[in-house]
């Protein structure tokens, strides 16, 4: 189902408490509520096998307050967007802090340190698309997130720290080569 369709449906269902009936037909889906019929086309093609994308080994793990992290990335993205690639750099520091930075040749550099709750494993120097990271962070409820790294050029996984089932919701971010 296209993301835009799900977003619109979510807005319509914001306060709905009754059950929803779903019907699939050909390349369309129909959501039926008491006073609403919502049609959407389905995306064509086969969905990629994501189980191979999600890393199973972890070399480093970071626990950080999602709101503080999101705000730091948002501020760094203001400058990164000037360069059109929106690349944010993350580097772990020895004192339990994480440095979030970006630069734009025309404008300058920005760097901000954010305290982490914990960090274990190898030092991290990684770059990523700021918009993707902010979208991932906004999807979580709760205060803290756990980020698992399996290498500097391997995808990394974000999960809510205190989730009953840690695999219930996860976000996968692929790094950008800059270091």
Task: Tell where the protein language model's regions lie, with residue ranges.
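DNA polymerase processivity clamps
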Residues: 1-43, 58-179
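Bateman (tandem CBS) regulatory domains
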Residues: 53-57
């Amino acid at each position: 189902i296209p993301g835009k369709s799900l977003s619109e449906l979510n807005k319509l269902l914001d306060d709905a408490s009754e059950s929803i009936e779903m019907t699939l037909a050909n390349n369309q889906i129909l959501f039926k509520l008491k006073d609403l019929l919502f049609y959407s086309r389905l995306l064509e093609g086969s969905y990629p096998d994501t189980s191979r994308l999600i890393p199973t080994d972890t070399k480093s793990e970071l626990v950080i307050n999602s709101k503080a992290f999101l705000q730091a990335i948002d501020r760094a993205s203001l400058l990164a967007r000037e360069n059109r690639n929106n690349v944010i750099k993350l580097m772990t520091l020895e004192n339990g802090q994480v440095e979030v930075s970006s630069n734009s040749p025309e404008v300058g550099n920005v760097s901000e340190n954010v305290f982490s709750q914990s960090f274990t494993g190898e030092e991290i120097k990684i770059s990523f698309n700021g918009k993707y990271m902010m979208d991932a962070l906004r999807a979580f409820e709760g205060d803290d997130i756990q980020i698992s790294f399996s290498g500097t050029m391997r995808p990394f996984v974000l999960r809510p720290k205190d989730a009953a089932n840690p695999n219930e919701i996860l976000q996968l971010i692929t790094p950008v080569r800059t270091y």
